[in-house]
Amino acid sequence: MRTRYFISFFVLAFVCCIGLFYNPEFAAPTSVNVNPADIAWMLTASGLVLLMTPGLSFFYGGMVSKKNIISTMLQSFVTLGVITVLYVCFGFSLCFGESFHGLIGNPLSFFMFKGVDLNTHPTLSPGIPFLLFAIFQLKFAIITPALITGSFAERVKFNAYLLFICLFSIFIYAPLAHWTWHPEGFLHKWGILDFAGGTVVHMSAGYAALAGAIILGSRKSFQDQQHVEPANIPFVILGTGMLWFGWFGFNAGSSLGANTTAVLAFATTVVASAAAMMAWIFFDAIRGKKVSAMGACIGAVVGLVAITPAAGFVTIPHALFIGFAASIISNLAVKAKDKYHLDDTLDVFPCHGLGGIVGMILTGVFAKDVGLFYGHTTTFLYHLLGLLIVSVYTFGGSYILYKLTEKVVPLRVSLQEEIDGLDYTQHGEVYKLKKPGQQ
């Protein structure tokens, strides 16, 4: 293990030292069509989206068993470091560099943020500095692999996880971002609408989570049908609040300016999430369950996921329906996965995968002026085709990447390590769970 970390350290040191020899000229700002209000809002939005990753750490960390809180939180939190370095080197170029037939960007277009300066970009960021656009997009790349971690919580090796998220970011996330958000991307040219990442972020994370749950297999506690109590439900509530707050930057910030589209996205975000939260707890109550804080939090997040692709394209009433529909479908899926003995630990696929799918389909239905609801079929049909392509690519590609990772380093901890808990066996950090004097 020390050898693998030595190699990782050497690679990081090499990348960081490139700056001593490779220091592209940073152009002075010359753009005159930049609105300071747009810059102020996008700086704020970038900070809000960054907050979502620590929020996700609390959200996931509170759901797992006490012996796995730290490991689960760290798996989300560490993406802030890993993905940032990767994105500066190649990730941004793969997402938004010179397009190769609408499939992927040239990895050297913006190597080490070359040419990413304080001026606007004519197609990608005509109203804000290109550097600000890149930093905003970086936050999306950070949280996407973090979302996956909930599916294989309590049983994945940390070093294997680090390798997988690097591969995922390069071979899954970057192509999807290019297809969908680059002006030359083929999904973008088809007219497929993804305002803030329902497809790029949530569907990709959901399908990668599904593949991960299948390949890593179920936990021992799941096999033994042991009920695992959430470690800290207040953590879950705190994480939900941080996610909800950050999501305003996620969705409204995707307007790339302080404008009326941002206002609409802000409003639809809060409305859809509220509808989804209430739908989840009422639906649970109808089925004989007690109204729970966990249910309210999960429902709220499902609504946020579902409205993400539609936030700037739909009306307030349609946002209510999108949140409601996604909540019911995800709730049913959580129950259904247990029947198939699928140990997706924190229900990532039912919540993010299906939430993103519902949002993508209903965006094709309700998108103002071009949706099925307004008498147009083209956008809706392309959304269905895009859904098929993205589903096959993300699930199949992620499955292959897990297998490749397994060839390099085992994905799963040993049975004894799982029993002892990953906080101790992977990180050597544990809560004191016993009273002083107890063995």
Spell out what each predicted region is.
Residues 1-439:
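Hydrophobic alpha-helical transmembrane bundles of multi-pass membrane proteins
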